[in-house]
Amino acid sequence: MTKKILIVRSSSLGDLVFVLPAISDIAKHYPGATIDWVVEEAFAEIPSWHPAVNRVITISHRRWRKKWWSSEARSERAEFKKIVRQTKYDIVLDMQALMKSVWVVRQTLGERHGLDWKSARERIASLFYNKRHHVEFWQPAVIRQRELAALALGYSYEGPPDFALQAFTDGVEIQNYAVVMPSASRDDKLWPEEDWHAALDLLVEHGLELRVLAGNAKEAERAAELVKKYPNVEFLVGLPLKEVAHQLAAARLMIGLDSGLTHLSAALGRPTIGIYCASTPVRTPLTGAGMTASLGDRGVPPSRDAVLLKLNQALGESKEDSSEETSGEQVAKQPEF
């Protein structure tokens, strides 16, 4: 009998990217499965990229929480409940383990699976599942998601992660530009300007054009000041997510602060350097088929020399355009749990 599976993982961009290999694993072990996915409306594109996803069901928690008891929000929640209950699922798998995802799970029909008390980020969430699974907390997010799906559906996963983004990568011609993401919404995420200049100088010396990503006007303004002395700079601001993915897939390499788009670049198989200043890469390292380096840690920005070393390596990898898979490097010590 065909399994009907509902994935609950609503946000954010990088976290949704981490789930894609688990969907590939499910599809491999249950090729006839019907896989639906509940996601925040702003990120609905990402699940739709995976060919094994049957239906994307959107929610609007980010809007609802601002006016939870308004007639509009109540009406939208009722409509969501009506839609999600059209199918009785064999397994409802909460891959987020937060109380906001528990709210979604409680609207569904089906056996509810999630992380156990010791594995969940918000431990109280584990009390609302029919079946709880233990997954080691301090390990990369892609592995955690693959393990959780395997435990819930009763299989063993193997092989490198498949992000199923071939629609962006198959037949693409790599262009002579680097995608750079030097800005962030929080100051504690930023890397020093003089260090950025050293990295950008190296890219320009190798003849690469610069394409600069920014999430909003403020970030674009900061980035514009940073790159004002460089020729051949193009700003990628306000582009649809699908177009950003195409830009990343055709880049020689990407270097950026820890963000969902940096993780997307790695998932697309491009050489990617991630700069971590306010978060730890222990749980969220860059993961992909190309060369990756996750540098720095929470409160410990990576040194200029460490970044330039890996950037030189990425330049060599991208120049060769090798088809060999190379493992990502994570420069961080695992904290005690």
Task: Tell what function each PLM region has.
Residues 1-337:
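Catalytic machinery of carbohydrate-active enzymes
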